[in-house]
From Swiss-Prot:
Protein's name in the database: Protein mono-ADP-ribosyltransferase PARP6
GO BP terms in the entry: endoplasmic reticulum unfolded protein response; positive regulation of dendrite morphogenesis; protein auto-ADP-ribosylation
Highest taxon listed in the record's lineage: Eukaryota
Domain PARP catalytic as annotated: residue spans: 394-620
Organism: Homo sapiens (Human)
Species classification: Eukaryota, Metazoa, Chordata, Craniata, Vertebrata
């Protein structure tokens, strides 16, 4: 007979009698003979006390000595744009399902682990990454973990904090020399915590005060970018667990996120705390080896694989790579833009400098070798494969499998290269609908977010202190292949610098569109910046000559492209203003928000000034309607 597992929770007061005999806490003819280890019960109760009744659910299997423990991780602390970029539902918990031996618990076999979101059926790549992380964590813990060991650890912990125990003697010894410092690094144990029984709120505070250093998330109701339109958006605000909270928003310290939480409240609470520590910083670690990424400008928004060859092979064979078919179906215009940027960088005379990262693509005919290898760059072969990537317009008009077959016939490396272009993008890009910034005069407008949670948190802290404004950043399209993967970096006095740095080192911005349009057109041998009058004439000419192509064209139809970004910048004393040329030496104080693309020498209105109240109002309108819905 096939016995199906039954879920149990405190609300299950009714139901048919046949299923009740399998439920946790109910004695039945089959379940009566099964022994449930008391440490398992204690750990389950600890989860309920520290989190909530709904944070854990249990499923027993009748006569089988197995039990599934579902731990519900609340991820509402993630910002809206982060959860969207990571393809997770921030309104729904991530479920960690661990299968233990019912009678042996920690003395039994190592538990199997599943990670899922019930409503997130496809493309849950974050779940695969988290499953791998928690699997490694459990394997390490299981080497020394047992029911007796856990009980001993808890007894030691409790005796340490008894009024007659070690902590009292330790404090007395300290008082001979000096008073206990009132420092965040040494939380003070109040006498009230050492005497009598605490109330529930105080007890929970006491628990948190006694933890090892680790990361956890709170969920204050704060808007995504500090703008008022959305009451649902949450602020990522990591803190050291058990220590007095630091400034209003402290930056994430990713090194702490691999610290092992205490076993004081059992293994289930420990693994939940570890998952909470790791989730906000998944983008900072390789999805395969779990080693921290090393980037010139820090981590980026989306999780990715590192450049180690073993990781690249595993990434390919595990199928974690973003499916090109899905991306073309859901964001064809974005894929079109990514391919255009890759082509511009590859065809640049400066490709040896700016075409970074170079693709790491596994050979489909020999999965043990790399067809494209950063250590052995072959730009000609790469160009041939890129030329064989069919237009995204064609891909949307027929069967994707048939189009893939056609590409494979043209060049077997074309489709793997397309997959790499999509999966290596570490920024969140969304094509804006009709409610876009009309004064930019282009249909190719994108929401562009590249800052990881830690940088966005630091940005918000600085914004509360100093305020912010908007300014344009102009850079030739050949540079954006790298910017989307490495971030907007301070290129002054480096090999990446294309223009002069007359006003010092930093990221160059301008409130005036004509200045940024000038920078965006420079590249591919063009090193003279057009004057504002020339840009105005070009803009007027492009908008009076009858257009052969519709302004509402969905896809890019030209390889002659100009682009500029609209950034939000902190208005602190670090921002150096030299007339209409601004220099920000602090990369954490600049975050990209929007991206605009123009074809065939087209430019937008050269007279736009982001400090104009009407322009600012329009920017705020689009942010309010786009950031929160995308």
């Amino acid at each position: 007979m096939d016995i199906k597992g039954q879920f149990w929770n405190d609300d299950d007061s009714e139901g048919d009698n046949e299923s009740e005999e399998f439920l946790y806490g109910v004695q039945g003819s089959c379940a009566a003979d099964l022994y449930r280890h008391p440490q398992l019960d204690a750990d389950i109760e600890a989860v309920k006390e520290i989190y909530s009744e709904n944070s854990v659910s249990i499923r027993e299997y009748g006569t089988i000595d197995d039990v599934d423990i579902d731990l519900h991780i609340n991820i509402s602390f993630l910002d809206e744009e982060v959860s969207t970029a990571w393809k997770v539902l921030r309104t729904e918990p991530i479920v960690l399902r661990l299968r233990f031996s019912l009678s042996q618990y920690l003395d039994g076999p190592e538990p199997s682990i599943e990670v899922f979101q019930p409503s997130n059926k496809e493309g849950f790549g974050l779940g695969l990454q988290l499953k791998k992380i928690l699997g490694m964590f459990t394997s390490q813990q299981w080497k020394h973990l047992s029911n007796d060991f856990l009980k001993t650890q808890q007894e030691k912990r409790h005796s340490w904090f008894k009024a007659s125990g070690t902590i009292k003697k330790f404090r007395a010894g300290l008082s001979i020399f000096s008073p206990i410092p009132k420092s965040p690094s040494f939380p003070i144990i109040q006498d009230s915590m050492l005497k009598g029984k605490l109330g529930v709120p105080e007890l929970r505070v006491g628990r948190l005060m006694n933890r090892s250093i680790s990361c956890t998330m709170k969920n204050p109701k704060v808007e995504v970018f500090g703008y008022p339109p959305s009451p649902q958006a949450g602020l990522l605000c990591p803190q050291h667990v058990g220590l007095p909270p630091p400034a209003r928003t402290s930056p994430l310290v990713s090194g702490h996120c691999k610290n092992i939480p205490t076993l004081e409240y059992g293994f289930l609470v420990q693994i939940m705390k570890y998952a909470e520590q790791r989730i906000p910083t998944l983008n900072e670690y390789c999805v395969v080896c779990d080693e921290q990424h090393v980037f010139q400008n820090g981590s980026m928004l989306k999780p990715a694989v590192c450049t180690r060859e073993l990781c690249v092979f595993s990434f390919y064979t595990l199928g974690v790579m973003s499916g090109a078919a899905e991306e073309v179906a859901t964001g064809a215009e974005v894929v079109d833009l990514l391919v255009a940027m890759c082509r511009a960088a590859l065809e640049s005379p400066r490709k040896s400098i700016i075409f970074e990262p170079y693709p790491s693509v596994v050979d489909p005919t020999d999965p043990k070798t790399l067809a494209f290898n950063p250590k052995k760059k072959n730009y000609e072969r790469l160009q041939k494969a890129l030329d064989s990537v069919m237009s995204i317009r064609e891909m949307t008009q027929g069967s994707y499998l048939e189009i893939k077959k056609q590409m494979d016939k043209l060049d077997p490396l074309a489709h793997p290269l397309l997959q790499w272009i999509i999966s290596s993008n570490r920024s969140h890009i969304v094509k804006l609908p009709l409610s876009r910034l009309k004064f930019m005069h282009t249909s190719h407008q994108f929401l562009l977010l590249s800052s990881p949670p830690a940088k966005e948190a630091r940005f918000r802290t600085a914004k509360k202190l100093y305020g912010s404004t908007f300014a344009f950043h102009g850079s030739h399209i050949e540079n954006w292949h790298s910017i989307l993967r490495n971030g907007l970096v301070n290129a002054s006095y480096t090999k990446l610098q294309l223009h002069g740095a007359a006003y010092g080192k930093g990221i160059y911005l301008s409130p005036i569109s004509s200045i940024s349009f000038g920078y965006s057109g420079m590249g591919k041998g063009q090193h003279r910046m057009p004057s504002k009058d020339e840009l105005v004439q070009r803009y007027n000419r492009m908008n009076t000559i009858p257009q052969t192509r519709s302004i509402q064209s969905r896809f890019l139809q030209s390889r002659n492209l100009n682009c500029i970004a609209l950034c939000e910048v902190i208005t602190s004393k670090d921002l150096q203003k030299h007339g209409n040329i601004w220099v920000c030496p602090v990369s954490d104080h600049v975050c990209t928000r929007f991206f605009f693309v123009y074809e065939d020498g087209q430019v937008g209105d050269a007279n736009i000034n982001t400090q104009d109240p009407k322009i600012q109002k329009e920017i705020m309108r689009v942010i309010g309607t786009q950031v929160y819905t995308n």
